[in-house]
C-alpha cells in the first residue's frame, strides 16, 4: 500500500488534487449541513470504487461518529474499501493512539487522519511521525467563525464583522477555544505532513469554500493543505484554486448526488488553466 501512495504522490507534485470524501456513519456514506441534518448517500465500497475509476487523485474516508462514541474506525470496512481502489487512501475517525493509527494502516490506508485525538494530546502527532513517517500523518481541522472579539486570537474582518476561526472537535460538536490558524501551524511543527481543513460554516451548503480560512492556513504552514466544506459545483473548485495557494480540494455532495464524474470536474479545471492530472 505504501508504494502506491508514494508513486502517485510523486506524479502529483505540480498538479492540484481533486479528492472525494466519504463521511461514514454506521457503515453508510452520509452527508449533512454544518455537520448536522445527516442524510444517506450510499454504500462506501461502491462509491469508493466509482471514484477510483473516475479519476480521483485520492480518497478520504472519515468515520464521523467514532470520536464522539469513543471507539475506533471500523477496520473491516476500511479494508473492504482499500481492496477496490488504487489511489492514495486517507482514513480518519477515532484515532487517539499509536495503536489506533497502526490498525488503520494495517487495514489498507496510506495515511491516517487525526482530529480530536491530536487536540487532546498534541504529542501524539510527534509519536505518529516518528513511527510511521510524516507523510502518513494528516491533521484534520474543523473550523468555524467565532464572532466574539478576542485580542489573543488571529482576528479578521469581513463585511464589517470581526471574527476568528475556532477549532471544533468530536465531529464538530464541541468547541475548543483554539485558534484554527495557530493550531494548524502548531500541528505542522509537531509532525503533521498535511492539513485537511474543513469550514463548518460552509459544510453542505454548496456556497463555495471559505477562501479566507484556506489561504490564511496555507500562509501559516509549510505542509500541503486540503480545502474542504462548501463545494457545490465545479466553479467552486476553480475559485479555491484560483484565489488561494491550496494544494487540493475535497468534495462530497457534488460527487455523491450529481451525475458527474471526477474527471468531468477536472476537465473543467483544466479548461480554466488549473493544472490537474487527467
Task: Map each language-model feature to its residues.
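Glycine-rich, proline-tolerant flexible connector loops at the mouths of alpha/beta enzymes
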Residues: 58-76, 116, 196-208
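Glycine/small-residue-rich loop that forms an oxyanion/phosphate-binding "nest" at active or ligand-binding sites
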Residues: 74-132
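Conserved anion-binding
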Residues: 24-26, 30-31, 35, 109-197, ...
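Conserved, mostly hydrophobic/aromatic
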Residues: 23, 51, 59, 104, ...
Amino acid at each position: 500500500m505504501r508504494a502506491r501512495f508514494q508513486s502517485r504522490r510523486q506524479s502529483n507534485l505540480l498538479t492540484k488534487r481533486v479528492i472525494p470524501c466519504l463521511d461514514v456513519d454506521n457503515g453508510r456514506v452520509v452527508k449533512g449541513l454544518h455537520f448536522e441534518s445527516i442524510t444517506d448517500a450510499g454504500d462506501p465500497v461502491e462509491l469508493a470504487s466509482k471514484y477510483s475509476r473516475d479519476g480521483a487523485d485520492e480518497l478520504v474516508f472519515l468515520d464521523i461518529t467514532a470520536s464522539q462514541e469513543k471507539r475506533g474506525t471500523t477496520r473491516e470496512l476500511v479494508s473492504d474499501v482499500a481492496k477496490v481502489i488504487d489511489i492514495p487512501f486517507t482514513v480518519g475517525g477515532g484515532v487517539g493512539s499509536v495503536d489506533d493509527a497502526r490498525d488503520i494502516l494495517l487495514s489498507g490506508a496510506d495515511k491516517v487522519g487525526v482530529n480530536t485525538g491530536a487536540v487532546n494530546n498534541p504529542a501524539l502527532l510527534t509519536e505518529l511521525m516518528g513511527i510511521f513517517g510524516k507523510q502518513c500523518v494528516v491533521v484534520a481541522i474543523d473550523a468555524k467563525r467565532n464572532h466574539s472579539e478576542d485580542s489573543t486570537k488571529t482576528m479578521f474582518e469581513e463585511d464589517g464583522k470581526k471574527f476568528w476561526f475556532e477549532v471544533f472537535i468530536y465531529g464538530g460538536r464541541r468547541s475548543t477555544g483554539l485558534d484554527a490558524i495557530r493550531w494548524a501551524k502548531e500541528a505542522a511543527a509537531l509532525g503533521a505532513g498535511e492539513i485537511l481543513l474543513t469550514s463548518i460554516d460552509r459544510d453542505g451548503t454548496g456556497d463555495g469554500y471559505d477562501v479566507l480560512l484556506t489561504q490564511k492556513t496555507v500562509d501559516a504552514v509549510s505542509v500541503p493543505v486540503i480545502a474542504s466544506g462548501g463545494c457545490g459545483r465545479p466553479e467552486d473548485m476553480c475559485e479555491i484554486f484560483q484565489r488561494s495557494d491550496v494544494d487540493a480540494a475535497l468534495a462530497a455532495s457534488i460527487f455523491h448526488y450529481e451525475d458527474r464524474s471526477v474527471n468531468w470536474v477536472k476537465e473543467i479545471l483544466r479548461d480554466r488553466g488549473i493544472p490537474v492530472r487527467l
